[in-house]
Amino acid sequence: MADSSVNLSQGLLTFRDVTVDFSQEEWECLDSAQRALYIEVMLENYSNLVYVENYCICDTVCQHVKTEKESCNELGEMLHEPSNCALYNRSDTTEASNNYRCCKDQDASLDSSNPDRLKSTHTGKERCESKDCAKSSSLCSSIAQDQRTNSTNKEQRQEKYDDHFISTHSLMQQAIYIGENPHQCMKYGKCFSSASSLGVQQRTDTGNKPYKCNICDKSFTECSSLKEHRKTHQRLRAGTNPYKCNDCGKSFSYLSALQSHHKRHTGEKRYKCKECGKSYAYRTGLKRHQKIHTAEECYSCQYCGKVFHQLSHFKSHFTLHTGEKPYKCNECHRSFPHYVFFRRHKKNHSLQKSHKCKECGKSFFILSHLKTHYRIHTGEKPYKCTKCDKLFTQYSHLRRHQRIYTGKKLYRCEVCDKWFTLSSSLSRHQKIHTEAKTYKCKDCDIFFNHYSSLRRHQKVHTGERHYTCKQCGKSFTRGSTLRVHQRIHTGEKPYKCSECDKSFTQASQLRTHQRVHTGEKPYVCKECGKSLTTCAILRAHQKIHTGEKPYKCMECDRSYIQYSHLKRHQKVHTGEKHKIVNNVT
C-alpha cells in the first residue's frame, strides 16, 4: 500500500483526464437517452481506471452524481443507488484539475481498513480547492457541510460501500482476465465487453445517428466519427488536402479516400462475392450486395429490377423513375430527388465562393470543383471509356456515357411511358406535357419548348456552322454532329448489335436496328392506325394523309413527300439512271 501513496503524489491519470464535460446549454440539448448513455459511459470509464488500493471515498462522487441526476429528472433514480457510486469518479486529485477534493493526504495511503484515518478525512478540515469554476466550489462546500453533519452515518455506510466496491472490482477484473463479454446483442447474438460498445452496435443496426454536424446536418452513430468529420470542414475552408491523385489532380483529406478514389482510374475490383462471383471496387458495395443472398425481406423495383433491403432506399430510388423531386430549397426554389443532394446544395448558400478560376473568373465553393472546372481550359480528360476510348473530364460523365452500351434507361415519363438514360433528359421531356411552346422562330413561325432548341434551330436560317471537318471541309452546327460525322472517315462503328453483329456509328441507329429483331413498332399513326419503327418514318407517312409534298423538283415542278424520292427523280434529268442501265447491260 506504500507504493499507492507514492503513485498518488506523482499524479497518475485521473478521471478528469478522460472525462467529457458539457456546458449547461449543451446538456439541455441532449435527450434522456443521450444523457443516460453519457452517465453510463462515464461510469464505465471510471471502472477501467480504478485500482483496488487507489480509490477515493465514495460519498463525494455519490453527491456529484446526485447533482447530475437532479439536472435531468427524466433519468429517475438510476444514479441514486449506492451500487452506481461504487463505479464512479475516484480521486480527481491532480493539481491542474482539482474541481472537488475531500482528501489531501499525500504521505499516507487511503486504507479503508483504518477507521481513524477515514474519520479524519471526512471531518471537513481540509477545504476544497477549486481552480476551474464556481460550480465546483459550491459542490465541495455542500460535500463538506454534509460530511460534518453526517460523519457517523457515512462511516457506517463507507464499510458497506467498501465491501460492494471490492466485490464489483473483483468481478470486473475477473471478466477482463478471462476475456468475458457480458453484454450480448439480442438480435445477432454477438457479445461485447462494454455496454457502450453494444450501444454503438445497436445504433448501427437500427440506423440511429444521434450525433449531428451543425454545418451540413450529417449524422453519425459515434461521437468520435462526428469529431473526425468536422475536420473535413476545417480542411475544406483552409483548402488543405494533403493527398493528391497523380492521374486527375484531385486532392483528398485522407489517404484512405485517395486510395478509394484511385480505383476509378485502375478499374480494380478486389472484393468478390463468394455466392455469385460478382466483384466490387469497394467493401461497402460487396456488403450491400451480399444482403441479396442473406436477407429475408427485400424490395424489388418493377421498372429496372434493382433490389433493395431497406424501404427508405427503395422509395428514394423510385423517384428516379417518376422524376419526383420532393426536397425543395426555400432560398432558390430548386428541387432535388434525394435528401443527400438537397443537403449538399444547402451548403452553397452558407459558404462563400472563395475559389476563383484565373481563366474565366468563375467562382466555386470547393477547391475540388475549381480543379474539375479548370480541365475545360486545359483540355485534360483523365477518364477513358474502355469500349470506344472516348475521354471525359469527370467520372460522372463517363458513367453517364457508358449507359449507351448497356442500354439502361432508368428514367421513365409517367405521361407517355417514354424512357430516358439521363434525369436531365426526362426533365426536359416532361416540359412537353406540362408547358406550352413559348419560344417562337421569327423566320418560320415554328414554336419550341426550350430556348436552347430554338437557338439550335435558328442556325438553319443563319447558316452558322462553327464545327468544320478537317478531312472533307464539311461544316456542322453542333460539335456532337461533327464527332459522329468523323466516324465516316475513321470507319469507327462502336455500337454493335448483339443479335447479328452488325455495327453502327450512332447509338440511335443501333436502337432503330434492334427493332428489326424485336418487331417493336412504337410509333402509331392516329389517322390509319399503322405502326412504324421510327419517328421520322411516321412523319413521312403522315404527309400521305395531309397531302403535303414539300420537296419540289426545280426542273419540272414535280413535288414529292420525301427527300429521297426527289433525289431519285432528279436522276431522270441528269441522265444518271440511263448510265446505270447501260453499265448493267
Swiss-Prot record:
Per the record, the domain of life is Eukaryota
Q: Which cysteines link up through disulfide bonds? A: none
Task: Report the locations given in the UniProt record.
Answer: Nucleus
ZnF C2H2-type span: 183-205, 211-233, 243-265, 271-293, 299-321, 327-349, 355-377, 383-405, 411-433, 439-461, 467-489, 495-517, 523-545, 551-573
Q: Which GO terms describe its cellular component?
A: nucleus
GO molecular-function term, one example from the UniProt record: zinc ion binding
Report the function annotation for this chain: May be involved in transcriptional regulation.
What's the family? Belongs to the krueppel C2H2-type zinc-finger protein family.
What is the protein name for this chain?
Answer: Zinc finger protein 54
Which species is the source of this protein? Mus musculus (Mouse)
* Gene it is expressed from: Zfp54
